[in-house]
Amino acid sequence: MGKEKTHINIVVIGHVDAGKSTTTGHLIYKCGGIDKRVIEKYEKEASEMGKQSFKYAWVMDKLKAERERGITIDIALWKFETSKYYFTIIDAPGHRDFIKNMITGTSQADCAVLVIASPTGEFEAGIAKNGQTREHALLAYTLGVKQMIVAINKMDEKSTNYSQARYDEIVKEVSSFIKKIGYNPEKVAFVPISGWNGDNMLERSDKMEWYKGPTLLEALDAIVEPKRPHDKPLRIPLQDVYKIGGIGTVPVGRVETGIIKPGMVVTFAPAGLSTEVKSVEMHHEQLPEARPGDNVGFNVKNVSVKEIKRGMVAGDSKNDPPQETEKFVAQVIVLNHPGQIHAGYSPVLDCHTAHIACKFTEIVDKVDRRTGAVVAKEGTAAVVLKNGDAAMVELTPSRPMCVESFTEYPPLGRFAVRDMRQTVAVGVIKSTVKKAPGKAGDKKGAAAPSKKK
């Protein structure tokens, strides 16, 4: 056994008909962990339903259907590997809660693959001002996904017909809009592909001799290896807390930063409780330590299952322990709110595993959504927000909550604003004010029963 390959998370973004499912399905199909027998079974089903045209998309379709029904998916389906990395597709849009998943998602994407349709009309529609392409790319950038690959798809379509001129035109347009968002187009690979025929997916296409760049697989292999945050203090947002007979209380969550090991004293925020970790396990095996990305259960002493719950955060008592957040300032971008947002607005925030109503106590300033620079105020009226606006906002949680600034602990510093059953805005936390310990009501607030989602 050599050194294990590095794991890389990718998110696939782009307009609704750009061919994301076919392209992703193709990669998983060719380099992934899908059993050949399963593939044959799916192909047979697809052809019986007269859906051969869905060549690779059925892979993703099957996955989405299972996801929607809440079935735990055979995770191998979302994975594929290259000579250098193991890839996991952490989400693909088209899923109802894509935006929410991308923000509260269990993991940070290391790279975004933006799929663009090249045919006449399709490209223009996808990149239009109100198209999803821009919104997805802006979201990816705002949420800290700093590497991007652009796959220019459907090069085999009649209107495109593998044309270099069309490719050049698209590269120019896309470069200009991703540059406005904050990406550096010179560091982005633009790969002309056919997710359908496989041109430039794994092997070079003989139909585009003019193209000298990498195939999609080579571009994925050339991703810069991300630094994992194991040297930061420990943070584990709790997903669940179990009471296991003969063992006791076992909180479960994903290590986002730092390292947890038996014998360590951990603090749970916002409850303000500290206790010793007796053991750490993953997949029913005891571990000497767990690192970022690991989903673990850890057994704790003398804490009842009533005192800690989903949405709380565990950290090392001796190294910047997590604390209750009294209020915080965030840069918020409004995506789809039907009206105007005024100070006093109190939607639900999904931040890591917490799901808590927070009040927009003050809308401080509107800002440029790309640079973050303050936009000069007009007149003295209170600032009001509408779709497309970005602003610095001070928020106050309606009940005890623990969040962190995005620069210190990224997964605990980004959130989705939910209202009317949809994501109306996203935010990145710039600074937090911690509640002074020992204030009356600390314990009581923490033990209040949580409303289930």
UniProtKB/Swiss-Prot annotation:
Predominant localisation class: cytoplasm
Subunit structure: Binds to actin.
Organism: Dictyostelium discoideum
Binding site for GTP: 14-21, 153-156, 194-196
Residue ranges of the region described as G5: 194-196
Segments for region (G4): 153-156
Domain named tr-type G: residues: 5-230
GO biological process, one term: actin filament bundle assembly
Descriptive protein name: Elongation factor 1-alpha
Entry's EC annotation: 3.6.5.-
Keywords: Actin-binding, Cytoplasm, Elongation factor, GTP-binding, Hydrolase, Nucleotide-binding, Protein biosynthesis
PROSITE patterns, sorted: G_TR_1, G_TR_2
Molecular function terms, GO-annotated: actin filament binding; actin monomer binding; calcium-dependent protein binding; GTP binding; GTPase activity; translation elongation factor activity
Family: Belongs to the TRAFAC class translation factor GTPase superfamily. Classic translation factor GTPase family. EF-Tu/EF-1A subfamily.
Role description: Translation elongation factor that catalyzes the GTP-dependent binding of aminoacyl-tRNA (aa-tRNA) to the A-site of ribosomes during the elongation phase of protein synthesis. Base pairing between the mRNA codon and the aa-tRNA anticodon promotes GTP hydrolysis, releasing the aa-tRNA from EEF1A1 and allowing its accommodation into the ribosome. The growing protein chain is subsequently transferred from the P-site peptidyl tRNA to the A-site aa-tRNA, extending it by one amino acid through ribosome-catalyzed peptide bond formation.
Originating gene: eef1a1
Organismal lineage: Eukaryota, Amoebozoa, Evosea, Eumycetozoa, Dictyostelia
